[in-house]
């Protein structure tokens, strides 16, 4: 732009000024500017003779609306600059069109001409000056040419190209080439170019292919390493979670056991309803009662029974049983009145109607407290075994730790603990690191109810040596269920290896963490109880006792618990239990050939307590060795001569506690045979159960090998016939009664049948067995061999010591009790017989060819064994792996009364509410057993 002069008259500008598109292109010649304006253009700011620049609009200049062009400051009178819209939008130019050559010529800025269809030109807008600088020529390829070029390059058919670019065939490496590359990769994962070229020449492949293979191999190796690390972290995380869960459960159990509630049915404060001092568990919002056994229709196991008393415990007679064992367990200040509102599952000599009684003074008809002997109570200062968590063991290691340096097995012996009979050395530790210990248990079988450990929450088994307690923990749908029982109610423990077909099923179903190691094997432990366990339930609302949550109340009716797990964990648990409770260790029996020492630390295995010999049992008037697994005394925890256990002279002599748990002896005239009369027989006399009957009983005395009471009442029937009730409590819990074939565990003698009380009421005639053994010592197997016409419960018992073998005695049982005595019997599971029927017991009678044939009768008793395992994790509380349609489980009926008085027939079932057990011979299953209590049994009742 030219420089402007500043004449005195204001000066005139004749040049074209193009400030913007909104400014006029041509300014009038007479446009005068003030000195201020000119100085403003020149960058100077004078202070005199200021004049305003006229504001002529763009439209006025274009349209020539100025009437006086000589006077630039003149505008029409009607012009109002305030109403002028100074913001004007730029007109949009027409969209340009492109010709084939798409060439742009120089355009004129004064006019915009329409483009030619052949060679369109884009001219400048009218707002541009005519003599402005010409724009540069932009040459571009037309859209059509661009499309054609792209189509030609992509190989479209229009351009004549191929539809797909040719791909080179992928070269596959041979096995030799791959092996060579793997060897080189093991030497160096990223070789230099010289090595890669050498490899390419050796394998006759391009060096580029070698480079790519090494890259892919490094990526694959990194991926494999990352996955392995993730799997390792996952396993460690799961193990930490399991250990944390075990620790929390142990703490919760310890808090509950340490509760000082005075209303405990167990000795040592193991309460059925505790003061809820446990901070890990919620406080209950309602009172719950503990019912071991419910007669009448089965109730829902999900809902705890509400207690009738203000303190919701002692609702079953088993609480009285426990309190009678330990009179000092409850202080005098806590004496309360409780109501026995249900019949007990504990066998008693007679029934007692509902009445109130004191905890400290139980009625004599139930039990009489001991006065001269204080029963064992758990103590917390017996032993101390440091706990150690091992991921490989799946739980707490019992004896995998190093022995404490202060422990000396040969130290001086202290006076024995009169409460437990335990002898400890002066240098033995006196505190526990943890009171509850976890041991591996993959499968739990109680009767027909099974629980498989598919996850850690499905089944967790604990034991507490200081508290003398076993516990099973089961979690289902957010509810925690627990089964507890004390060491003092364990009659016997039998241990043997798991055989086929259960072995394959367990190996195929168990999780990897629960499977035995290559040098291990599966172990089965059968625990026989004398009373049912205690059941607990913990929900978000609270915790407390509940009813039996197992299907069909199997845990209340069947007192045999079968636990399957790894041998190492089982033997370590048994070793610790034996040390904590020598009396319980004296009833542990091992299968011949089992060697627990290979799974225990030799430093601890050398201190194993010794087992009593069978001669000691016979000499002291106890039961002979139990049949089956324990008939060979050399199999009891090793060699008999090496581990022979002798009772210490400082330990209190064992006593038959059943004598103290029976009613007074009265009216014994003319009731029993001239041979030895047991206290239980005398109790039956005093209860008038046998009043007016001419009966010869094969009496039963509880086994005192464990120094704790067994059943209060048990009868051995005629042992001259094809079976006897008290033969053995080894019951082969996982052998199917319907199978006929060799079993993995043989019985004691080919001529001695093995008794199997069974919950399965299989309708098999006795005449089949009689045809197989017509002239054996079993007495011909006549259907009328047994005849009982009284309502007597026959529980699961041990072998009688007085009448050991079949044919050794001619004592028979013929009991003719009056019908009114039926109302006094407190049991719902009774077996009656007529001339054409027999009581319900299953037998396995071995033949000379070692073939076990089963004889099953027409009813059942509630002391049974489990059939062979049908692997399936059940649900809690009302589910079982033994479905009715299972081909491994025979359909059966449980807990009924076979009415066999003259003129009466039918199966009296007290479970009419969807029980999984089927009444296989139930012509009159509609009779309610509950209505029969307190009433005379009428043959016309159908």
UniProtKB/Swiss-Prot annotation:
UniProt keywords, alphabetically: DNA-binding, Homeobox, Nucleus, Transcription, Transcription regulation
Residue stretches of biased makeup (Basic and acidic residues): 142-151
DNA-binding region: 164-224
GO function terms (MF aspect): DNA-binding transcription activator activity, RNA polymerase II-specific; DNA-binding transcription factor activity; RNA polymerase II cis-regulatory region sequence-specific DNA binding
Localisation: Nucleus
UniProt keyword annotation of Transcription regulation present: yes
CDD domains in alphabetical order: homeodomain
UniProt xrefs under Pfam families: Homeodomain (PF00046)
Major localisation: nucleus
GO terms for cellular component: chromatin; nucleus
Stretches with biased composition (Low complexity): 153-164
GO biological processes: cell differentiation; positive regulation of glycolytic fermentation to ethanol; regulation of transcription by RNA polymerase II
Listed SUPFAM superfamilies: Homeodomain-like
Biased composition (Polar residues): 1-19, 61-73, 99-116, 122-135, 604-614, 630-641
UniProt region (Disordered), positions on chain: 1-54, 61-80, 87-172, 604-651, 892-922
This protein's record includes keyword DNA-binding: yes
Protein's job: Trnascription factor that regulates the expression of the homocitrate synthase (HCS) lys4.
Annotated PANTHER family: HEMATOPOIETICALLY-EXPRESSED HOMEOBOX PROTEIN HHEX, HOMEOBOX PROTEIN HHEX
Name listed for the protein in its UniProt record: Homeobox transcription factor phx1
Species of the source: Schizosaccharomyces pombe (strain 972 / ATCC 24843)
Lineage of origin: Eukaryota, Fungi, Dikarya, Ascomycota, Taphrinomycotina
Originating gene: phx1
């Amino acid at each position: 732009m030219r420089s402007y002069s500043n004449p005195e008259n204001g000066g005139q500008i004749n040049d074209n000024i193009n400030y913007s598109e909104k400014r006029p292109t041509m300014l009038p010649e007479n446009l005068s500017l003030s000195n201020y304006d000119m100085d403003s253009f020149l960058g100077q700011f004078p202070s005199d003779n200021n004049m305003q620049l006229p504001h002529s609009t763009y439209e006025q200049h274009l349209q020539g609306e100025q009437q006086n062009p000589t006077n630039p400051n003149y505008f029409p009178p009607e012009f109002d600059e305030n109403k002028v819209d100074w913001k004007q939008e730029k007109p949009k130019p027409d969209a340009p069109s492109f010709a084939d050559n798409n060439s742009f010529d120089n355009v004129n800025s004064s006019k915009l001409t329409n483009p030619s269809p052949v060679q369109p030109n884009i001219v400048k807008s009218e707002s541009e000056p005519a003599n402005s600088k010409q724009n540069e020529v932009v040459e571009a390829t037309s859209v059509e040419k661009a499309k054609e070029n792209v189509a030609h390059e992509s190989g479209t058919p229009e351009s004549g190209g191929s539809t797909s670019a040719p791909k080179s065939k992928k070269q596959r490496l041979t096995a030799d080439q791959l092996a060579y590359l793997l060897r080189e990769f093991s030497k160096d994962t990223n070789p230099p170019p010289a090595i890669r070229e050498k490899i390419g020449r050796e394998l006759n492949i391009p060096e580029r292919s070698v480079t790519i293979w090494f890259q892919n191999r490094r990526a694959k190796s990194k991926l494999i390493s990352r996955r392995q690390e993730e799997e390792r972290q996952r396993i460690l995380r799961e193990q930490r979670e399991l250990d944390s869960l075990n620790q929390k459960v142990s703490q919760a159990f310890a808090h509950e056991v340490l509760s000082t509630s005075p209303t405990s049915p167990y000795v040592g404060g193991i309460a059925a309803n505790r003061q809820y001092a446990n901070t890990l568990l919620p406080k209950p919002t309602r009172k719950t009662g503990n019912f071991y056994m419910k007669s009448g229709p089965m109730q829902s196991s999900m809902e705890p029974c509400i207690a009738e008393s203000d303190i919701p415990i002692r609702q079953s007679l088993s609480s009285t049983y426990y309190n009678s064992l330990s009179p000092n367990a409850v202080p005098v200040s806590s004496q309360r009145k409780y109501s026995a509102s249900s019949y007990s599952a504990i066998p008693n000599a007679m029934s007692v109607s509902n009445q109130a009684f004191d905890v400290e003074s139980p009625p004599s008809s139930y039990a009489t407290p001991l006065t001269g002997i204080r029963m064992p109570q758990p103590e917390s200062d017996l032993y101390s075994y440091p706990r150690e968590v091992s991921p490989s063991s799946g739980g707490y290691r019992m004896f995998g730790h190093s022995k404490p340096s202060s422990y000396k097995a040969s130290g001086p012996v202290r006076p024995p603990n009169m409460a437990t009979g335990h002898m400890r050395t002066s240098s033995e530790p006196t505190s526990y690191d943890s009171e509850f210990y976890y041991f591996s248990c993959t499968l739990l079988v109680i009767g027909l109810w099974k629980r498989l450990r598919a996850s850690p929450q499905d089944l967790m088994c604990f034991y507490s040596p200081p508290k003398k307690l076993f516990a099973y923990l089961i979690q289902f749908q957010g509810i925690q269920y627990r089964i507890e029982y004390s060491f003092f109610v364990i009659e016997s423990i039998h241990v043997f290896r798991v055989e086929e077909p259960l072995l394959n099923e367990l190996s195929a179903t168990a999780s990897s963490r629960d499977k035995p190691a290559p040098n291990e094997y599966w172990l089965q432990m059968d625990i026989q109880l004398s009373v049912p366990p205690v059941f607990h339930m913990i929900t978000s609302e609270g915790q407390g006792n509940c009813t039996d949550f197992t299907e069909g109340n199997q845990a209340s009716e069947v007192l045999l618990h079968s636990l399957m797990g790894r041998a190492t964990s089982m033997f370590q648990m048994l070793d610790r239990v034996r040390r904590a409770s020598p009396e319980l260790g004296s009833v542990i029996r091992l299968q011949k050939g089992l060697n627990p020492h290979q799974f225990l630390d030799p430093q601890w295995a050398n201190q194993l307590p010794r087992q009593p010999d069978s001669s000691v049992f016979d000499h002291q008037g106890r039961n002979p060795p139990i049949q089956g697994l324990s008939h060979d005394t050399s199999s009891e925890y090793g060699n008999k001569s090496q581990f022979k256990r002798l009772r210490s002279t400082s330990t209190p002599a064992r006593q038959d506690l059943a004598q103290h748990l029976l009613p007074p002896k009265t009216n014994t005239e003319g009731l029993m045979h001239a041979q030895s009369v047991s206290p239980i027989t005398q109790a039956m006399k005093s209860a008038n159960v046998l009043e007016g009957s001419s009966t010869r009983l094969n009496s039963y005395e509880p086994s005192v090998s464990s120094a704790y009471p067994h059943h209060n009442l048990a009868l051995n029937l005629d042992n001259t016939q094809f079976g006897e009730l008290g033969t053995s409590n080894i019951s082969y819990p996982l052998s199917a009664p319907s199978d006929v074939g060799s079993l993995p565990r043989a019985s004691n003698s080919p001529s001695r049948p093995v008794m199997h009380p069974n919950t399965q009421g299989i309708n098999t005639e006795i005449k089949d067995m009689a045809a197989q053994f017509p002239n054996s010592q079993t007495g011909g197997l006549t259907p009328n061999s047994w005849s009982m016409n009284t309502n007597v419960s026959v529980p699961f018992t041990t072998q009688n010591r007085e009448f050991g073998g079949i044919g050794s005695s001619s004592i028979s049982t013929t009991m003719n009790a009056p019908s009114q005595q039926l109302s006094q019997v407190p049991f719902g599971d009774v077996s009656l017989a007529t001339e054409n029927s027999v009581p319900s017991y299953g037998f396995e009678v071995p033949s000379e060819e070692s073939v076990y044939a089963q004889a099953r009768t027409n009813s059942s008793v509630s002391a049974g064994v489990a059939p062979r395992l049908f692997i399936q994790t059940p649900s809690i509380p009302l589910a079982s792996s033994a479905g009715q349609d299972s081909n491994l489980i025979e359909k059966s009926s449980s807990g009924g009364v076979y009415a066999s008085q003259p003129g009466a027939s039918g199966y009296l079932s007290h479970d009419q509410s969807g029980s999984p057990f089927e009444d296989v011979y139930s012509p009159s299953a509609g009779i309610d057993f509950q209505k029969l209590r307190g009433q005379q049994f009428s043959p016309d009742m159908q």
